[in-house]
């Protein structure tokens, strides 16, 4: 995957909650960089510059280059904390170093295609219900995809695409599937048209009333 994002950071010297509050008021975002058998480093990012990157969906699933203390580190975003009152305010970042020899676990977005061509929509008038927007995958950095494609072109009413149905790029795995069938989550399904569903409900109610009358 092409590296599209480069960020510059300062090494953080001040520690503690009080220092964090002062730094945030000064327009800085505290962060921690860890992994790859190296010591964790506390960093500071400029909030406004960081927020511009966060407006791109690809930022969350790409390998990022962080320049700090005269060195460049390849990392992925592992956690992002926002202000619960003001979501446009970023409070903290967790960044993990990327190793060329160790698999990383990261969430990537799902891209749905073929909605309009799906028999359940085009011929049967059903409604697409997306149950997941992203999934957690495991792979080497060189195999990291920007997204996973979900093709609905052959999906009918009442049919569901599960995690195990997804076509994954080479070298990519879904860790949840190793835990058993109970973890094979539904990804997307096509519901019956509302009128048909209401007719079925009405018919079921009529059957119950007839049975009660007997």
Curated annotation (Swiss-Prot):
SUPFAM superfamilies: Ribosomal protein L25-like (SSF50715)
Residue ranges of the region described as Disordered: 193-214
Keywords, ordered alphabetically: Ribonucleoprotein, Ribosomal protein, RNA-binding, rRNA-binding
CDD domains: Ribosomal_L25_TL5_CTC (cd00495)
GO terms (BP aspect): translation
A GO molecular-function descriptor: 5S rRNA binding
Keyword tRNA processing: no
CC per GO annotation: cytosolic large ribosomal subunit
Composition bias type Acidic residues, residue spans: 198-214
Family the UniProt entry places it in: Belongs to the bacterial ribosomal protein bL25 family. CTC subfamily.
Role according to the record: This is one of the proteins that binds to the 5S RNA in the ribosome where it forms part of the central protuberance.
Subunit structure: Part of the 50S ribosomal subunit; part of the 5S rRNA/L5/L18/L25 subcomplex. Contacts the 5S rRNA. Binds to the 5S rRNA independently of L5 and L18.
Name of the protein: Large ribosomal subunit protein bL25
Species the sequence originates in: Nitrosococcus oceani (strain ATCC 19707 / BCRC 17464 / JCM 30415 / NCIMB 11848 / C-107)
Gene: rplY
